[in-house]
Amino acid sequence: MPRTIIEKIWDQHVVKSGEGKPDLLYIDLHLVHEVTSPQAFEGLRQKGRKVRRPQNTFATMDHNIPTVNRFVIKDEIAKKQVGALERNCAEFGVRLADLHSVDQGIVHVVGPELGLTLPGKTIVCGDSHTSTHGAFGALAFGIGTSEVEHVLSTQTLWQQRPKTLEIRVDGKLQKGVTAKDVILAVIGAHGVKFGSGYVIEYTGEVFRNMTMDERMTVCNMSIEAGARAGLIAPDEVTFEYCRGRKYAPQGEDFEAAIKEWEELKTDPGATYDKTIVLDGNEISPMVTWGINPGMVLPVDASIPGPEDFAQEDDQKEAIRAYEYMGVHPHQRIEDITIEHVFIGSCTNSRMTDLRQAASMIEGQKVADHVRAIVVPGSQSVKLQAEEEGLHKIFLEAGFEWRESGCSMCLSMNNDVVPEGERCASTSNRNFEGRQGKGARTHLVSPAMAAMAAIHGRFVDVRKFNQEKTVV
């Protein structure tokens, strides 16, 4: 019987199943960070248990670490969590990329970089954006702290079999339109709940033409569509990215692995529970204007009024968004000014993202009223960017160049947006208070964020493509 790639990976990992019951899945890779792991390790300690497969477990610290003076953690809770992760990994024999390691970074950036993330794997982490790893043709999803403990002790997890959703985007993207714009356009068209109960497979010409960095951006925000996970079938782009990575198979073993990975594709005749189709030619640079990622518009559009929403609940949420965000109905997106720019997060902090941003700003200066920061997703990204001279472009333009970490994506560290101020952010969530109490977040691509920093407001990057090319 023809199967989707989602069904193939799921079936390969079922340890136990029962009619009408969740399946017990074997987990190939468990990624751990400092925030959701302390209670899980303590649970093991209290029960006298060991980590079942420490070789299948990898930890790093990312959420609440400073990106300036990274070894001086002033927040007491953050300091305790980082210290606990160091002690727990030492006690239970788990690999740890700590603040002194060149392998340290955002967990969803370093997993792929190190070759831990590979096609066909089941991958979990105590973080909702674990779906990022689906870009490799892996089944990857976030779990809660109690589930973290369960995976640590058993290397398995009970899960309800998901429905399958195909999102197909064909055509050719306009210059200046990026992977971030594609996934924001999908969410804008269908809302933040349409993926509930599904795992998404992204198909079509647009995704096939993306780099692995770009595919990770798309899969990262599957969660903002309400989905459990999202993935893209592996191909030559995937295989070449994985080749030679630290923990990937090497030599003949890698070639043998490719033979297996080539089978990880949806069979002809396989059916999805639902299919959504978009035209890539019609996608524009996108900007969120409200308080969830579905409140998003092309940069050359205007904010809708309450009368533009058919449902009363949507009208009420729009009114709340106007008040919180300090915007008004029918205001042009290009008339919105910003005070902060954040280029970083597990969504957009990789080399492709930094190159895109740098290509837009070279030889220009950040607007006087704007504070702009660039936070590489890992120490490896930081070092590579510095080798290419990207940091000089950012610094000369007036950006701050930071150490790796989650940073301003979430207000769990020193990098926050002050109350009532507005940030053009390459992160994945624009909820109320996400970047700080009263902070106003607009989600955009790295290219859009970079140009907002220069102009002090949102501008259409397509207008600048005669001089600046987004790579």
Swiss-Prot record:
GO molecular function: 3-isopropylmalate dehydratase activity; 4 iron, 4 sulfur cluster binding; metal ion binding
Enzyme class: lyase
Cofactor binding comment, as recorded: Binds 1 [4Fe-4S] cluster per subunit.
InterPro entries assigned to the protein according to its UniProt record, in alphabetical order: 3-IsopropMal_deHydase_lsu, Acnase/IPM_dHydase_lsu_aba_1/3, Acoase/IPM_deHydtase_lsu_aba, Aconitase_4Fe-4S_BS, Aconitase_4Fe-4S_dom, IPM_dehydratase_rel_enz, IPMI_cat
Catalytic activity: (2R,3S)-3-isopropylmalate = (2S)-2-isopropylmalate
One Gene Ontology term from the biological process aspect of the record: L-leucine biosynthetic process
Superkingdom of origin organism: Bacteria
Record-listed E.C. numbers: 4.2.1.33
Keyword terms, alphabetized: 4Fe-4S, Amino-acid biosynthesis, Branched-chain amino acid biosynthesis, Iron, Iron-sulfur, Leucine biosynthesis, Lyase, Metal-binding
PROSITE patterns to which the protein is assigned, alphabetical: ACONITASE_1
Cofactor(s) it depends on: [4Fe-4S] cluster
Physiological role: Catalyzes the isomerization between 2-isopropylmalate and 3-isopropylmalate, via the formation of 2-isopropylmaleate.
Subunit structure: Heterodimer of LeuC and LeuD.
Family the entry assigns: Belongs to the aconitase/IPM isomerase family. LeuC type 1 subfamily.
PANTHER family: 3-ISOPROPYLMALATE DEHYDRATASE, HOMOACONITASE, MITOCHONDRIAL-RELATED
Name under which the protein is recorded: 3-isopropylmalate dehydratase large subunit
Species the sequence originates in: Bacillus pumilus (strain SAFR-032)
Phylogenetic placement of the source organism: Bacteria, Bacillati, Bacillota, Bacilli, Bacillales
